[in-house]
């Protein structure tokens, strides 16, 4: 009898999950496009108070439906996907009832004003003739999104409004120039859409002026989330069993351990580069580490060589993974491309994988030459930061065996519902990529020079988590933040300035790298302890990434750890 009951519970859950996803994609058309469902490509999110109230009621209705199901009776993937959906709905309700970002954060609207258009241009999921009508429809919707933003926004934090001004300029450039690659493929349609293009750019110009002249002078909100909201948001965003206090405690301890490890890695290199150094200098941990990092920064690519170099490194890393038998390599294509102009100047590279509902797409490893308007000094500083060895470490993180490999494996996972595919865990995904950096360095990839960069990036991930919590649940000042980054974790000034800004604009996101990596390393240690000499690294890695991208706590459960 039990099985019959379980089956009805499974059927009931699958129906709820299917209905939930359907309404989610309908209410978030930009997300639908990104995920690879193109039924809503001509629509934008409705940010009106009525729509938001209706959306909250819908979430609560689905929460009640899930409460009627006995989760313990669910079989297979449904058992965990039920909990993932429940946690996600709770997060949505928390955002609607407590965070209320649409009322104070102008960056919320950029998803509709810029990203919605970019998504139609960036991926060749359909011929230009099919995508341009969606582009037209979305451009026609932009004035109503702007009207909603103007009506909703009160008490924005100043840094959010200033950033919205910059991003709106990016949206204007996108409408005027960034959509050209798509329009050039259909000359007649290009001609027809030109007046709308100009009108949309003018509407965005007007919005930018409103942000500068109206919202900015009254932007008196606090960028700090506050301890109570941060604790809740962190729990939802990370879906981790680690508490806020435990995360801070482990980050502080890890900071000291990693500072020691990077010094111990730097010391033999320092002696090689500076054979006449005296013992007092050799004992100065900070000086030795900084000098070696500085020396390694001298070997770097430039605008002309960066894309070619990245292609070589992808091949090198792939061969290393294969020859050391670390994890199964997928056969889905990876294209190394120059980064689109309007995305440049932030990170040097990112991995753009196809959405889980878009099974045919390629993965792009986008690599950035610097923006055209940068000075010679600024370009030099950027490429010193992203030097040859750092690009090798970054390629491990973004592509091989990091994001590209993991997401290709995740897209192979199938379950009765799409819950796990759509509500992927950023903590699992980022944690895997940071874990891969450490694993590759442990295996000797790139020698001590790459290990220096890996440990530097590890310090950066630790600092990210400390910043996130100290800023939003504490009162960390700009000076304290800059000291942590530049003195404790060897970051360049330009990078630290950008991170101080990002840490104020976002909350709970910067913790994902450290927490995810910590959970992955804890998981591996648990499996090593359990299996002893029978532990097989490749078998372990393949198993960890065989379940899609759920929170790490569920992978631990699935592996019986």
What are these regions, as identified by a protein language model?
Residues 1-3:
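Bacterial N-terminal signal peptides
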Residues 5-561:
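N-terminal maturation segment of proteins
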């Amino acid at each position: 009898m039990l099985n019959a009951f379980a089956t009805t519970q499974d059927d009931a859950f699958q129906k709820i999950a299917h209905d939930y996803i359907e309404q989610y994609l309908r209410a978030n058309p930009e997300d639908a496009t990104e995920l690879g469902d193109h039924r809503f490509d001509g629509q934008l999110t409705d940010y009106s108070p009525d729509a938001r109230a209706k959306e909250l009621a819908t979430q609560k209705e689905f929460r009640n439906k899930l409460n009627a199901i006995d989760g313990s009776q669910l079989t297979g993937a449904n058992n965990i996907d039920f909990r993932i959906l429940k946690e996600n709905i709770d997060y949505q309700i928390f955002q609607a009832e407590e965070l209320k970002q649409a009322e104070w954060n102008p960056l919320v609207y950029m998803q509709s004003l810029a990203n919605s258009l970019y998504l139609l241009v960036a991926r060749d999921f359909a011929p230009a003739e099919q995508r341009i009508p969606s582009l037209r429809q979305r451009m026609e919707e932009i004035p109503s999104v702007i009207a909603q933003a103007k009506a909703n926004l009160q008490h924005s934090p100043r840094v959010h409004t200033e950033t919205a001004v910059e991003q709106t300029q990016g949206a204007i450039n996108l409408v005027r120039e960034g959509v050209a690659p798509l329009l050039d493929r259909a000359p007649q349609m290009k001609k027809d859409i030109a007046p709308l293009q100009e009108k949309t750019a003018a509407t965005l110009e007007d919005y930018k002026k409103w942000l500068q002249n109206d919202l900015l002078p009254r932007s008196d909100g606090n960028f700090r989330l506050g301890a109570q909201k941060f604790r809740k948001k962190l729990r939802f965003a990370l879906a981790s069993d680690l508490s806020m206090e435990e995360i801070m405690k482990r980050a502080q301890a890890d900071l000291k351990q990693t500072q020691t490890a990077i010094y111990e890695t730097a010391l033999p290199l320092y002696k090689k580069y500076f054979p006449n150094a005296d013992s007092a200098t050799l004992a100065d941990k900070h000086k030795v580490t900084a000098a070696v990092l500085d020396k390694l920064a001298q070997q770097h690519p430039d605008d002309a060589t960066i894309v070619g170099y990245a292609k070589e490194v992808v091949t090198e890393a792939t061969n290393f993974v294969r020859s050391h038998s670390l994890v199964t390599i997928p056969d889905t294509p990876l294209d190394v491309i120059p980064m689109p102009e309007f995305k440049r100047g932030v990170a040097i590279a990112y991995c753009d994988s196809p959405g889980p509902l878009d099974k045919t797409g390629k993965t792009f490893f986008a690599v950035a030459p610097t923006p055209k308007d940068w000075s010679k000094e600024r370009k030099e500083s950027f490429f010193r930061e992203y030097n040859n060895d750092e690009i090798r470490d970054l390629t491990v993180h973004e592509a091989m065996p990091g994001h590209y490999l993991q997401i290709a494996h995740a897209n192979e996972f199938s379950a009765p519902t799409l819950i796990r595919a759509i509500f992927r865990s950023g903590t699992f995904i980022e944690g895997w990529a940071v874990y891969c950096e450490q694993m590759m360095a442990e295996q000797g990839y790139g020698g001590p020079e790459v290990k220096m960069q890996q440990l530097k990036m590890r310090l950066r991930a630790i600092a990210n988590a400390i910043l996130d919590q100290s800023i939003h649940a504490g009162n960390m000042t700009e000076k304290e933040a800059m000291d942590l980054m530049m003195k404790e974790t060897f970051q360049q000034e330009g990078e630290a300035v950008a991170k101080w800004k990002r840490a104020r604009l976002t909350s709970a996101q910067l913790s994902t790298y450290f927490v995810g990596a910590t959970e992955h390393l804890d998981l591996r240690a648990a499996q090593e302890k359990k299996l002893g000499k029978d532990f097989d690294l490749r078998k372990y890695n393949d198993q960890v990434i065989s379940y899609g991208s759920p929170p790490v706590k569920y992978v631990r459960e699935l592996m019986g750890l």
